[in-house]
A protein has these predicted regions:
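Bacterial N-terminal signal peptides
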Residues: 6-16
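Mid-to-C-terminal alpha-helical segments outside catalytic/metal-binding sites
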Residues: 19-25, 29, 33-61, 122, ...
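Active-site neighborhood of phospho(di)ester-bond hydrolases with catalytic His/Asp-centered motifs
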Residues: 22-25, 64-65, 107-108, 135, ...
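Conserved, mostly hydrophobic/aromatic
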Residues: 26, 54, 93, 124, ...
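Divalent metal-dependent hydrolysis catalytic cores, especially in the metallo-beta-lactamase
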Residues: 27, 40-43, 48-77, 103-111, ...
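Acidic-and-aromatic substrate-binding clefts and catalytic sites of carbohydrate-active enzymes
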Residues: 34-45, 70-72, 82-86, 110-118, ...
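Active-site gating/metal-coordination segments in enzymes
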Residues: 76-182
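Catalytic pocket-lining loop regions of alpha/beta-barrel enzymes
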Residues: 131-133, 140, 146-268
C-alpha cells in the first residue's frame, strides 16, 4: 500500500539574518531498560546519538518525550519495582537532556492510571530538565475515556499538570491492539471533560489526534476538534497538534484539508522515535511529498510552541 508520510516542520525564526532553525516536537530517547521493552532487541538511543542524528538532518532543537510510561504498560510483562523503575527512567531522561540543554527540552511521562502517577508528576515538576511538560500515551497505558473510573483519574492528572504549568503532549488514540473504541465520541469526551481541567496550559494532540495513521477513527476525532476551532470554542484556545502521521495516497488530500480546517498555526513538526527508516533525515526527506502549498509550508514552518 502506497503511503505518504506527513511531517510538519516547525522553524524557529531568529532575529536578523540568522536562518530559521527546525524544531522537532515529538522525539524520543530510550534508556537501556525502555528500549527493549518498546522494540524487541533494541538497546535504545542516548541524547548524544540523537544530537548526531539531529545534526545530520539540520534539526536545531527537539522536545524529548520520556518513555518511562512504557515500563507501566499493562499488557507487557511486569517490571520489577515498577514505581521505582518509572522514576529512574524519567531521571535517566533528565540526565540525558541536561547534557544538551541548549538543544533539548525534556517531558516527563507516566501511565496516568497508576496510583503513583501524580506523585511522579509533582516530582518531575521540580526537575528543571522535565518540568516543561508531560507525555501521556493512552494507547500504551490502555486508557479508555469511556470508562468513568479512567476519566475521573485523567481529570485529576490534567488538573495537576495545569496546576504545575506543565504542557501536555498526549497520544489520545485508544489502544489499537485490543480494538478499544476511538472516534468522535471519545474526542468529544476529551474536549468536554479533559481540556477544561487544563485551561491554562498548552495541550498537544500527537499524530493529529490519531495513532500514527489517518484512518476513519482519526478522521472522526480530528473533525471534532476542527469543528470546535471553527466555532471558536474557548476550550481549544491552547490546543495544538503534532503532525507525525501517515496517510494512504487517497487519504493524503483529506489530511491536508484537515490541517487547513484546524489551521496551520496549530500544527507542530514531529518525527517520532529515531529508528531505522524513521531517522530525522528520513523524516525531512519525506516532508515535501505531502500536498501543501508553498504558503502553507511557510506558515507551518514558522510555528513556535508557547512553552519555548
Amino acid at each position: 500500500m502506497v503511503r505518504v508520510r506527513l511531517l510538519a516542520i516547525v522553524l524557529f525564526a531568529f532575529p536578523g539574518l540568522i536562518p530559521a532553525q527546525i524544531i522537532d516536537y515529538h522525539q524520543h530517547i530510550y534508556s537501556p531498560v525502555a528500549g527493549p521493552i518498546s522494540i524487541a532487541g533494541w538497546r535504545g538511543v542516548t541524547s548524544d546519538e540523537l544530537i548526531a542524528l539531529m545534526n545530520e538532518a539540520h534539526i536545531s532543537r527537539a522536545v524529548v518525550l520520556s518513555t518511562a510510561y512504557s515500563l507501566a504498560n499493562p499488557h507487557k510483562p511486569p517490571v520489577a519495582n515498577e514505581r521505582e523503575a518509572v522514576r529512574k527512567d524519567n531521571e535517566w531522561t533528565s540526565v540525558q537532556v541536561a547534557k544538551h540543554a541548549d538543544r533539548l527540552i525534556g517531558f516527563c511521562s507516566v501511565n496516568p492510571l497508576k496510583p503513583y502517577a501524580i506523585e511522579e508528576m509533582n516530582r518531575c515538576a521540580k526537575d528543571p530538565n522535565l518540568r516543561t511538560g508531560l507525555k501521556l500515551h493512552f494507547g500504551n497505558s490502555d486508557v479508555d475515556v469511556d470508562n468513568p473510573a479512567h476519566l475521573t483519574r485523567l481529570k485529576k492528572v490534567f488538573h495537576v499538570a495545569n496546576r504545575n504549568r506543565m504542557a501536555i503532549l498526549v497520544h489520545a488514540h485508544a489502544n489499537v491492539n485490543f480494538n478499544r473504541p476511538y472516534g468522535a465520541r471519545e474526542a468529544r469526551v476529551f474536549l468536554e471533560q479533559l481540556l477544561p481541567e487544563a485551561a491554562d496550559i498548552v495541550v498537544v494532540l500527537a499524530h493529529l489526534a490519531g495513532a500514527g495513521g489517518f484512518d476513519e477513527s482519526t478522521q472522526q476525532a480530528s473533525a471534532v476538534y476542527a469543528e470546535a476551532i471553527a466555532r471558536h470554542d474557548p476550550r481549544v484556545r491552547n490546543l495544538y497538534f503534532d503532525a507525525c502521521v501517515s496517510a494512504t495516497a487517497s487519504e493524503a488530500p483529506m489530511l491536508a484539508q484537515r490541517i487547513r480546517e484546524i489551521g496551520v498555526s496549530r500544527i507542530f513538526y514531529g518525527s517520532d522515535a529515531p529508528v531505522k527508516g524513521n531517522l530525522p533525515v528520513d523524516a525531512l526527506a519525506r516532508w515535501h511529498a505531502f500536498p501543501l502549498s508553498a504558503d502553507e509550508f511557510h506558515s507551518i514552518e514558522r510555528n513556535v510552541a508557547p512553552f519555548f
